[in-house]
Amino acid sequence: MLTNDLDFRLEPRLKEMYEQHKIRAQKIDWGYHEFLPWDKGMDFKRVPWDESQVTLPSGVITAIETALLTEVNLPWFTTYLSATFKGSLSVITDFIHTWTSEEDQHSNLLETYLLLTRSVNPKRIHELRKSVVEGGFEPDFHTPIEAMTYTTLQELATMVFYNNVAKVASKHDPDLATLLRRLAKDETLHYAFYRDVIRTHLELEPNYCYHIANVIKNFKMP
């Protein structure tokens, strides 16, 4: 019988996938301090920010701000996933904890880069970040299989976004391109896990495509 929950018969296979993810992630473990151009930093009290200090094209800055304001919602994303998968497969709860720890560095890296390079008005970016987090995240999908599908698509979209922005940024700041590609590696691993969870369910019961198609048709980034 088709349900919108995850199938407990798949838990052993998903546990194997989770262990494989941890091994792959450990091989590329990193700290966000490794990817920041610290030598470009200046004291904002001693040298106040001025628009003349900005060196990146406005389109690149907008892309980085967009990524940052998506990543800062991690607490809301984690709350959403934890609530949605409560009572479902324990391995998914374990993965969400790992996913959160790996995603936690992303907003720190992006915001610190923008501040170090003086690419944004520090007061404005602080206000934007606060406003976005206060606004929260209202999901459109509330069942485990739909949430899994939504997160798969979101990770894929974010991975593609980071890689595309890195291509453009490489002409203006190699440091930025490098850190974006590093973020894309995390997104690639996360996407692969979520995708494979969906794949195993489709292999077991092809009619899961009913729920999956609904998410695909109505998907939008947070």
Description of each model-found segment:
Residues 1-222:
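Non-heme di-metal
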